[in-house]
Amino acid sequence: PSATHVRTNHNIPDIFFEQDLVGVLKENGYKTALGGKNHAYLKPADLDFWSEYGHWGKNKKATPAEKETARFLNQQARGQWLEPSPISPEEQHPTKIVNEALAWIEKQKENPFFVWVSFPEPHNPYQVCEPYYSMFSPDKLPVLKTSRKDLAKKGEKYRILAQLEDASCPNLEQDMPRIRANYIG
């Protein structure tokens, strides 16, 4: 943070640098790509290939399945989904992101390349499809070694985060065992 002046996802306008990795690679003849979540200041024009995904789906939805996935994640599974997700393993973000990256890499036969693969998961909406949903039983997970009582020791940032969690997961304490199992799945 002291070098770039950026400490969070929310203060990208404050970024400070003379040259970045993508720029150096492009100057040296590399083809560049981003597949997945853009946790940077980069824009589509900065790279040769761009396929961005957010927490609620692909940013540019092209297929009916991508549109349905985004609808489900945005409207039904906003914070978490406590049942097996209707999104198939083939349509889950990590699978799509990896497949798109591999397809792009295949086209780079004669080119040096850099591909940034970044998954939105594990992150809310916490949803997972079969067979992963059933892999970890909530009642067999280790007991948590922390609770909301520890927030008093953690400071303001953690209290704000807890408020955000409560807003997206109104029954968080009750649902936490299933959410943890989904996260691991």
Locations of regions flagged by a protein language model:
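Catalytic-site neighborhoods of secreted/periplasmic enzymes
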Residues: 1-90, 97
